[in-house]
Amino acid sequence: MGSALMFTDTHEWILDNGDGSVTIGISNQAQQLLGDVVFVDMPEVGDNTQAGETFSLVESVKAASDLYAPVTGEIIEINEELEDSPELINESPYSAGWIVKIKLADRNELNNLMSSEDYLAANAE
C-alpha cells in the first residue's frame, strides 16, 4: 500500500491522480473481510457522485457491500476488467482492482480523508 493513498472509514482507498481526478477502490482489509468477490455493480461513466453516498456495490461469496463515494464529482472512467474478472479486487486491490476514476468537484474534500498511517492505526486488530 503506497503512502500516497488516502482512505475512508468505510474502507475505500483514494489515489490523487494529480490532474483533478482520483482513482478509487476498496482496501485490502475490506476485500479480506468480504472474501472472494464475485460481482461488482459498476456505475456509469458520466454519473455524478456525492461524498458519503453509495455509488457501487461489491458482492462476494459472504456478503454484498455498498461502496461509498469519498468525494463529490463525476465518474470519468470505470474499470471494465472487473465486469469479467471481479476477483482482481481480491488479487490486487491497490492496482488492477481499482473500481472508478472520479473528476473532483471540490479538491478540499481530500482533506477529510485518512492517511495510510491513520487508516492502519484505526483498523489495527
From Swiss-Prot:
GO cellular component: cytosol; glycine cleavage complex
Domain Lipoyl-binding: 21-103
N6-lipoyllysine carried by residues: K62
Coiled coil regions in record: none
InterPro entries linked to this entry: Biotin_lipoyl (IPR000089), GCV_H (IPR002930), GCV_H/Fam206 (IPR033753), GCV_H_sub (IPR017453), Single_hybrid_motif (IPR011053)
Keywords per UniProt: Lipoyl
Cofactor(s) annotated in UniProt: (R)-lipoate
Cofactor info, note text: Binds 1 lipoyl cofactor covalently.
Pfam entry (one): GCV_H
Subunit structure: The glycine cleavage system is composed of four proteins: P, T, L and H.
HAMAP family: GcvH (MF_00272)
Function: The glycine cleavage system catalyzes the degradation of glycine. The H protein shuttles the methylamine group of glycine from the P protein to the T protein.
Family, as annotated: Belongs to the GcvH family.
Name of the protein: Glycine cleavage system H protein
Species this chain originates from: Psychromonas ingrahamii (strain DSM 17664 / CCUG 51855 / 37)
